[in-house]
Amino acid sequence: MKFTSVLAFFLATLTASATPLYKRQNVTSGGGTVPVIITGGPAVSGSQSNVTTTTLFNSTSTLNITQLYQIATQVNQTLQSESSSGIIIVTNWRSIETLSFFCSIVFNTSKTIVITENFLWGVPILSSSDAEGRGTLVAGRDKVVYSGVFPPYTVPVGVLSGQKNVQWFFDACEPTLIASNSTIRTQYSNFTSAQISSNASSGTNTSSSSSSPLVPIIYEEGYSQSLIQSLSSSIQGLVVVSSGTSHNSTVASWTSVDFPVVYASDGSSGHDGSGIGFISNTSIPQGAISAGYLSPIQAQTLLSIAIHNQVTSSSELQQIFPVSQQ
Ligand SMILES: *[C@@H]1O[C@H](CO)[C@@H](O)[C@H](O)[C@H]1NC(C)=O
Ligand SMILES: *[C@@H]1O[C@H](CO)[C@@H](O)[C@H](O)[C@H]1NC(C)=O
Ligand SMILES: *[C@@H]1O[C@H](CO)[C@@H](O)[C@H](O)[C@H]1NC(C)=O
Ligand SMILES: *[C@@H]1O[C@H](CO)[C@@H](O)[C@H](O)[C@H]1NC(C)=O
Ligand SMILES: *[C@@H]1O[C@H](CO)[C@@H](O)[C@H](O)[C@H]1NC(C)=O
Ligand SMILES: *[C@@H]1O[C@H](CO)[C@@H](O)[C@H](O)[C@H]1NC(C)=O
Ligand SMILES: *[C@@H]1O[C@H](CO)[C@@H](O)[C@H](O)[C@H]1NC(C)=O
Ligand SMILES: *[C@@H]1O[C@H](CO)[C@@H](O)[C@H](O)[C@H]1NC(C)=O
Ligand SMILES: *[C@@H]1O[C@H](CO)[C@@H](O)[C@H](O)[C@H]1NC(C)=O
Ligand SMILES: *[C@@H]1O[C@H](CO)[C@@H](O)[C@H](O)[C@H]1NC(C)=O
Ligand SMILES: *[C@@H]1O[C@H](CO)[C@@H](O)[C@H](O)[C@H]1NC(C)=O
Ligand SMILES: *[C@@H]1O[C@H](CO)[C@@H](O)[C@H](O)[C@H]1NC(C)=O
């Protein structure tokens, strides 16, 4: 099972950002350093020259949307002030999927953003020539480099071939979802803002009056009508993990709820366990939106970014998810 709990909440309180977000530590000085942002994951001992680390948090659980935007703000500042070809973000294993997808959507940059559990695995990527223009990448323990647009460890794009080198499998190119002519880039240019909105952006007043949307993930088999009713006043969106081929939804229609509902496939029905599935817009209840090939966590991340930018109508959301893009 991919999820440790049935409900994975993005919690709602936006903590005051007036407190210092990070502490900076000089690992080395001089030119040619690789910027590293630490948000969790195991501490790496041993000296590594040419690395400048900034510690934001030391989280052991899945990063929430507030933390993701805090990271984005820091990444944006760092990328603008450094001459490096990119940046490494170290995080815990639970957060790899949401962080790599979040960065793929939010950053429209030719610099490379490497998400990893251990910065040592990421350094060769940024040292390699030809690292730019590849978007967000995930560096795995196995020395393989994966695309950040797909669930981690599913779509390899290169392999480490030395201390400073990567053998890339493809020329640098843009994934369709976020290509420069994609719907997300052309019509939702506000998604590529790393700024934490300073005022409440949720359309409805919630008890916490926060700008961080709550978008839980539930399993199609695992919920009851009363659970949804008890949640409905406190959530801004919902991701339902489709039970797969045997479609036996307990809900025939979602047209009566006032938050967006996205159905996603967890890809576990695939023989090869690739972790990528597809759910078409014809096999979901009325009023719901299909996530296409996005995983449940990716759907949650994209929906949270959309809601953060006040994009909540079905017609708009349908264009964003990769199901009707032809
Ligand atoms: C996000 O997680 C941090 C650390 O666990 C927590 O302090 C904060 O309150 C959370 N924020 C939200 C919006 O849930
Ligand atoms: C980090 O290095 C820079 C340049 O070498 C230096 O100016 C700065 O004082 C150092 N900062 C710390 C905290 O050591
Ligand atoms: C890394 O640091 C070493 C010395 O610690 C230096 O010789 C080398 O040129 C540096 N490499 C880069 C790419 O800056
Ligand atoms: C994060 O905290 C854990 C303990 O909770 C500790 O073992 C680890 O070294 C810390 N990581 C960093 C980078 O400080
Ligand atoms: C984007 O451009 C490519 C060619 O560069 C084209 O094949 C594709 O159809 C375009 N997509 C959209 C949505 O316009
Ligand atoms: C993305 O970056 C390209 C090149 O820098 C730029 O032309 C385009 O307008 C940017 N798109 C968005 C949505 O910011
Ligand atoms: C990065 O920060 C600059 C200002 O410091 C801002 O103009 C720019 O829009 C930010 N970029 C993103 C992606 O938020
Ligand atoms: C929220 O921010 C926007 C600009 O980002 C501004 O136009 C709007 O007036 C603000 N709303 C409130 C209630 O402050
Ligand atoms: C939303 O909250 C504001 C102040 O927090 C209040 O003035 C307004 O009446 C509320 N709107 C609704 C629809 O509850
Ligand atoms: C739906 O559920 C009913 C009874 O629970 C069962 O008889 C039927 O075969 C199911 N349909 C599918 C497609 O699984
Ligand atoms: C972001 O862009 C979309 C599409 O243009 C628009 O509908 C939405 O209102 C924008 N969000 C904000 C907060 O301006
Ligand atoms: C499903 O998406 C296709 C485009 O791929 C569109 O033509 C069709 O109307 C959509 N169907 C529904 C039920 O939304």
From Swiss-Prot:
UniProt keyword Glycoprotein present: yes
Keywords from the UniProt entry: Glycoprotein, Signal, Sporulation
A biological process term (GO) from this entry: ascospore wall assembly
Induction note: Induced at very late stage of sporulation.
Chain positions carrying an annotated carbohydrate: 26, 50, 58, 64, 76, 108, 181, 190, 199, 205, 248, 281
Domain spans labelled Asparaginase/glutaminase: 19-324
Signal sequence annotation: 1-18
Family as reported in the entry's similarity comment: To yeast YGP1.
Task performed by this protein: Serves a protective function during the early stages of spore wall formation, and contributes to spore wall maturation.
Note in the entry: The program of events of meiosis and spore formation reflects the sequential expression of at least four temporally distinct classes of sporulation-specific genes, SPS100 and SPS101 genes define a distinct class of very late sporulation genes.
Name this polypeptide is given: Sporulation-specific wall maturation protein
Organism (species): Saccharomyces cerevisiae (strain ATCC 204508 / S288c)
Lineage, highest ranks first: Eukaryota, Fungi, Dikarya, Ascomycota, Saccharomycotina
